[in-house]
């Protein structure tokens, strides 16, 4: 962001999702409700895992960090979106790039964390007897720290390159938050090199994590098919079902939105996809990982019982 003097734009105007006051009020109520559910679900998931000793396992260690990322991810976007729906659509130059940095950082971190979770499921199903030895505390910490470090570097490089853009006198961002595609579309200079760099960073993040997840699930499926008992197969499948559903939803919207050239950016279509993965998915993840999970339900019951007994 050292070359801010290259632009005459002190701030940006976010066009939002609608010009209609009635629609804006309806969206405000809807997004506020979703955000409150997101906060409650993710904070609740973190607290249950922290308070119940039986959930102090690698699987739930990763799930704690997924909830933290989803909570942070939603907080980077939703509060500003809510404010824009009621008041001014302005966001400062620095505020815009700060939002972009944390958005890219947390999005990439979730990609790599989902890979770590897939590897955890692979070890649990393919090498159950060696699981406690392989998934040591040291390895678990590395599988969580790695995504944060790599994603920080990824996002930092992304924002440094984006800060080199010239915006001339145009400052209307045709989106409801500061994402890379609409900011690139706003620039009055040749963005080819920056687009290539962003596609390399985004593409490598998605491909590395997807290859890791795919390889893990191919091995998992191969192992499940070798299980003779029907109950054993169902138990193994149920262990992975929630994670696989979360991966499918998250990666589906990310690939649809980002792995395409700037010229194919569509305001309405891309905004719907963006609402889904920035506001809706952080709300869905706690539901996906808890509703079908008996361990989480039982842990919640135990925590509530202990609280009642302590009174």
Swiss-Prot record:
Broad class of the protein's primary localization: membrane
Highest taxon, organism lineage: Eukaryota
Segments on the Cytoplasmic face: 47-54, 120-138, 217-236, 292-311
Keyword annotations from UniProtKB, A to Z: Cell membrane, Disulfide bond, G-protein coupled receptor, Glycoprotein, Membrane, Olfaction, Receptor, Sensory transduction, Transducer, Transmembrane, Transmembrane helix
Keyword Coiled coil among record annotations: no
Topological type in the membrane: Multi-pass membrane protein
Entry-listed glycosylation sites: 5
Bilayer-crossing regions: 26-46, 55-75, 99-119, 139-159, 197-216, 237-257, 271-291
Main function: Odorant receptor.
Identification of the protein by name: Olfactory receptor 8H1
Organism, scientific name: Homo sapiens
Gene: OR8H1
């Amino acid at each position: 962001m050292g070359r801010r003097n290259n632009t005459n734009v002190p701030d940006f105007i976010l066009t939002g999702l609608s010009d209609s006051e009635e629609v804006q009020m309806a969206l405000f109520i809807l997004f506020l409700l979703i955000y409150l559910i997101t906060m409650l679900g993710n904070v609740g998931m973190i607290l249950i895992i922290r308070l119940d000793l039986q959930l102090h396992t690698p699987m739930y260690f990763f799930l704690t960090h997924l909830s933290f990322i989803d909570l942070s991810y939603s907080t980077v976007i939703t509060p500003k979106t809510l404010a824009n729906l009621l008041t001014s659509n302005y966001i400062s130059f620095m505020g815009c790039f700060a939002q972009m940095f944390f958005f890219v950082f947390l999005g990439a971190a979730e990609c790599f964390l989902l890979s770590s979770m897939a590897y955890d499921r692979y070890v649990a199903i393919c090498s159950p007897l060696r699981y406690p030895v392989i998934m040591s505390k040291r390895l678990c910490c590395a599988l969580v720290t790695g995504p944060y470090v790599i994603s920080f570097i990824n996002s930092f490089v992304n924002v440094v390159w984006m800060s080199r853009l010239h915006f001339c006198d145009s400052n209307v961002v045709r989106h409801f938050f500061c994402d890379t595609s609409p900011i690139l579309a706003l620039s009055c200079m040749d963005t080819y090199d920056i687009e290539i760099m962003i596609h390399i960073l985004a593409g490598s993040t998605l491909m590395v994590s997807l290859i890791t997840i795919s390889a893990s699930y191919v091995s998992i499926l191969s192992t499940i098919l070798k299980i003779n008992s029907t109950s054993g197969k169902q138990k193994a499948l149920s262990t992975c079902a929630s994670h696989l559903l979360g991966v499918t939803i998250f990666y589906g919207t990310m690939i649809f939105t980002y792995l395409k050239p700037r010229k194919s950016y569509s305001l309405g279509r891309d905004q719907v996809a963006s609402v889904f993965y920035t506001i809706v998915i952080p709300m869905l993840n706690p539901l996906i990982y808890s509703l079908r999970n008996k361990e989480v339900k039982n842990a919640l019951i135990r925590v509530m019982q202990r609280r009642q007994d302590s009174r």
